[in-house]
Amino acid sequence: AEYAFIAFPIKNAEAVNKGEKPVTELGVKAVDDLTLEVELEQAVPYFLNLVAFPSYYPLNEKFVTEKGDKFGLESDTTVYNGPFVLTDWKHEQGWKLKKNDQYWDKKTVKLDEINYSVVKEVATRVNLYDTNAIDFALLSGEFVDKYRNNKEEFGTYSQVSTYFLRMNQKRGGQDTPLKSQKLREAIALSIDKKNLSNVILNDGSKPADFLVPKGLATGPDGKDFQETFKNGIKPDAKKAAAAWEEAKKELGKDQVTIELLNYDTGNAKKVGEYVKDQIEKNLKGVTVNIKLQPFKQKLKLETEQDYDLSYAGWGPDYADPMTFLDMFQSNHSHNQMSFADPKYDDMIKKAGGELMGDAKKRWEELGKAEKLLLEQDVALVPLYQRGDAYVQKPNAKGIVHHNISPEYSFKWAYMTEKDGK
């Protein structure tokens, strides 16, 4: 399974996953009907964060076995134990959440039903909001100014997720132009991220030279990871042009065409066009062709490494820098760009192993690893830390926003009458 790695802190989990040990040797046992005992490979300071991640959720074995390959693919082949159950799931169109009468704390849940609509075009979304067809809508930058002064309905929040350009070094068994470290560096230097965040996105997003987002985690000294390390390459058009001159020598050519894989949604299209413009303007001789794909197909092409550049993002699975840094190890299932640096692998291995008992040294090692990844290897190009701008009807109350895992909790949500009663 692609996400098996998240269970590897458990004793023998990696060996069981590889088929090297039987599942009976996994470090988990049921002490009684309500208690699990978990043995770890070593102390993991963020383990309780991990067990709140969906990959750790318990499953009803009888139900899963009965549904087989169809488990989780439809609303009626999924089992629920939260405040709501999923119904009327029409793929790519929408779904409903209905109050779960079996939920242990159902008396707290005030809403009977929540209706989701999948609306890719923001203009359509805004029209639905303005005509009172929906109560909540995420906005893209061009609609922010329309609502910004409406204090009752408009808001923004910062996510602890980072968006970046993957730079694939091998495609179809052949090296891509991005195998050139100097070309990767030139691209990293060529993109004005402030303009991207403040003008193109205009939704509360912030420019990022870093991978590990601000607000994710603090070190032993109580300081934010980015406040301590301040890693990353700052954009500079002159330095970009100079790095491109060096890249030409590495590549043995003056012109390069690269493909940018992108989502087919409105905001992503704008970012893709901006990135293309910045690279082509600042690196004369580099041509960027954009390939738009639906979400699922884009992920498939990334997994198959059938791309050159890819506009991608990552949100945390748990509150530790490792959730961003470990996926660029050479053997990680989410590397997906043939990046490999034994020194980086060793740093991540140490931070996830022998240094677990020394918080200060572990923190320093993670900071050095991010610096190596972004400034020396230039494995990827951070673009921005995501912000979300939204409008919400004043009578929609009690929606809780989370930075990690599910974005919203509706357990405490309720609707008042539109006159405020």
What residue spans do the PLM features occupy?
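Gly/Pro-rich hinge or "lid" segments in bacterial periplasmic/extracellular proteins
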Residues: K11-E25, V31-L34, L40-V109, E113
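Ligand-binding "clamshell"
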Residues: D145-S158, D306, D320-N335, K393-K397
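Alpha-helical secondary-structure segments
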Residues: D33-E37, G82-P83, L111-E113, S161-F210, ...
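Long beta-strand-rich cores associated with HINT superfamily self-processing modules
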Residues: Y390-K421
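Ligand/substrate-recognition segments at binding pockets and active sites
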Residues: H91, E245-P316, D388
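Structural transition elements
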Residues: P207-E246, N267-K269, G357
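Ligand-site clamp/hinge motif
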Residues: Q102-K146
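Extracytoplasmic/peripheral linker and loop segments enriched in polar/acidic and small residues
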Residues: G19-T24, V28, G285-K298, L325-K393, ...
